[in-house]
Amino acid sequence: AAPKLMMSSTPQWKDKSLWFYKVNEDYGSFAPLPEAQKKVDELIKGKKTEMEKIAVLTHWVADNIRYSGISMGKGEGFTLHNTQMNYTDRCGVCKDIAGTLISFLRMAGFEAYPAMTMAGSRVESIPADHFNHCVAVVKLSNGTYMPLDPTWVPFCRELWSSAEQQQNYLPGVPEGSDLCITPVSAPENHYMRIKADNRLDANGTLRGTFTLTAERQSDSNKRRIINTRFHRSEEHT
């Protein structure tokens, strides 16, 4: 254990939220791009509900914008790179992946904004700069904001990783926001069931299949294991 000292000249979280919103809008981080608009139109074609559209856009970004931590030098920080750079390079860190999703959502007609969070740690009540991760929020038809994290959901079915429960985040929205927190998800929402169907042949050989059924974090963990091992086996082939 060690003491932790937090200091800030920002009076309240709403002030930081408004600043984060303004710095990215002024820079033009989410300006539309014709080539990207074509991709968005292609992805949402035939999708009827807002959740269908949000899901297909989130998963395309998660699966196609590769995580690559390359420093761009002076000027890095809370300003998200613009749509043209992200869509052209198809790689970047969390803020680039989140920024691409925000741009895609806006081109699909949604209100979407960036949000700051601290992956794996608690955010204290003092409105200081203690964030290490960038995510997105989208405004639903009922007026509420839904957090999305494309960095943590490649090749899985979730839109916000279940590993990020009770995680604080601060949206950069035009009306300003207080510090938010993701809800707890009950253990029964993350089940894994294994069904074995085996038969013993006359010659003593055991043959059969195992069927795995899983949801949320259990499902994501298994998909990650399978995907990682598949790529490793390809590298050694």
Language-model features: locations:
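Short, conserved phosphate-binding/catalytic loop or strand-edge motifs used
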Residues: 37-38, 73-82, 118-120
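Hydrophobic/aromatic-rich core segments of domains that either
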Residues: 95-185
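Conserved small/polar residues in nucleotide/adenosyl-binding loops
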Residues: 235-237
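Long, His/Glu/Asp-enriched segments that create or flank divalent metal/ion-associated functional microenvironments
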Residues: 179, 183, 188-197
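Active-site-proximal cofactor/substrate-binding loop regions of enzyme domains
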Residues: 54-56, 62, 68, 81-92, ...
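Alpha-helix capping and helix-loop boundary segments enriched in small/acidic/polar residues
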Residues: 31, 48, 73, 85-92, ...
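Secretory-pathway-linked proteins and extracytosolic
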Residues: 1-75, 202, 209-211, 215-230
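Short, solvent-exposed loop/turn segments at the edges of secondary structure
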Residues: 35, 129-133, 191
